[in-house]
Amino acid sequence: MSRIGNKVIVIPAGVSVEVNGATVTVKGPKGELVRSFNENITLEIAENEITVKRPNDTKEMKMLHGTTRALLANMVEGVSNGFSKALEMIGVGYRAQLQGTKLVLSVGKSHQDEVEAPENIKFVVATPTSIVVEGISKEAVGQTAAYIRSRRSPEPYKGKGIRYVGEYVRRKEGKTGK
């Protein structure tokens, strides 16, 4: 049984949280995030802490309680520190380059894949085979990184493709001849 919803969220210095009905606005040094939550979940802000409360102990409310607390904690973390996801490209001729806010991928296709950076997302290409997706929304960073990975996900025979840094790709044995 998870008790993540009962944990208090500490608001760091330089971050402000406003609650307007079911809409929460979190402002910080890196930017601003706005999100709507369920009306039944109440948020109490005291000094530099946010407490998430639920009206009753039904299964649905317990689920919403933990989810709301986790999303709110990620919003506070995002506007203060930000999130990043690193990817690496493995394969001959596989490379990435930036053209303005666009990421251009050469991954063994007859054409180049272009990925436009969504709002509040930034691409960093340190080397031609490494990509870092940075932003203030954990959800948007993860989705953008997953989209880039889907352009050429790692294949199990040679391990070529785009993968997260530290991701383990399960390898298969090739066909054996007669």
Curated annotation (Swiss-Prot):
One of its GO terms (biological process) is cytoplasmic translation. It comes from the Bacteria. Keywords: Ribonucleoprotein, Ribosomal protein, RNA-binding, rRNA-binding. The keyword Ribonucleoprotein applies. Pfam families: Ribosomal_L6. One of its GO terms (cellular component) is cytosolic large ribosomal subunit. GO terms for molecular function: rRNA binding; structural constituent of ribosome. The keyword Ribosomal protein applies. NCBIfam families: L6_bact. Belongs to the universal ribosomal protein uL6 family. Part of the 50S ribosomal subunit. This protein binds to the 23S rRNA, and is important in its secondary structure. It is located near the subunit interface in the base of the L7/L12 stalk, and near the tRNA binding site of the peptidyltransferase center. This is Large ribosomal subunit protein uL6. It comes from Lactococcus lactis subsp. cremoris (strain MG1363).
